[in-house]
Amino acid sequence: MLRKRAHSSEWSRQSDVTALPILSPAMTSALVLLNPFAGGGRAAKLEDAIRTHVRSDHPGARFVVAGTVADAHAMIEDTPPDARIVLVGGDGTVNRMLPALVRTQRELGIVPLGSGNDVARALGVYGLAWVDALAHALSAPATAMDAGVVTFGEREVPFLACCTCGFDSAVALRALNGPKFLRGLPRYLLATLRELVALRHWQLTVHCEGKPLRAGTTLFASALNTPTFGSGIPAVPHANIRDGLLDVLIAGRFSRAGAMVMLPRLLLGKHLADPRLHSNAFRGIEIHATPNVPIAVDGEYLGESAHLLIDVLPATLRVVARTNDTPAIT
């Protein structure tokens, strides 16, 4: 059983009473929950438009803007068992709601208005106008999706897109604290360039399902469920969110010049032929690090640890996806 994250934090504002719907939870067929801080405040600018649209075009749905993560979890848990949860935000929004979604087994739809949106990319809904994404999230069928969980210290944190260790996590922290006027890939690339100035390495020992996988100087070791991370970077293009496996991408020692040469290859998904990179599918891995390695999940920085476990949670969540044969929304 997943434990509730100890650091549940505020969305940074109190609940807006005017955003609360007329419908009671018992009458709700879906809960549309908006994170006003997603996408650097982009979601907040659409709050009134989305609320009005939900009330006029989707009267069975309930629209809310939660003041805190705890409030949002409580709203999810108060919805009827067959109600769908539609999150308006990005990967961070989805990650913070994931414990409640897994615990209640509610179906998940996404309206991607965040900075990262790698989960939305994997589900095929990234790039849709929010009106179309909302209609799809409320009406299309759901399918099973894998998740992952990282355990370190006393914490057990689930994720849908990725768990990064090392350089990638340091970049995630810089991206979270980056300029507000940048979103998505440009923000991530700026954070990457800034972290290259430091270019730290760690001594990592990685075991995959009990067998040695790698030991030595390592730039990063990141586990992916989705093909992309960092706002669309195709780190493991062959990753599959429904295969019951995660994929680890491990980078050995890189100089600054070598990392700069590798970056455009990574952006194009042409990096896996490099002998300093190793990719391996797994159900569970164990990592020992010296010194403590920074950890992030779905772009959310968690802290540092000398020891962590990463495991797949097969078919743990039902999500609304869109494939090439999904009928167009009209």
Task: Label each residue range with its predicted role.
Residues 43, 208, 215, 240-241, ...:
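ATP/nucleoside-binding phosphotransfer catalytic cores, i.e., glycine-rich phosphate-binding loops
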Residues 57, 63-66, 102-107, 111-219, ...:
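Catalytic core of DAGKc-family lipid kinases
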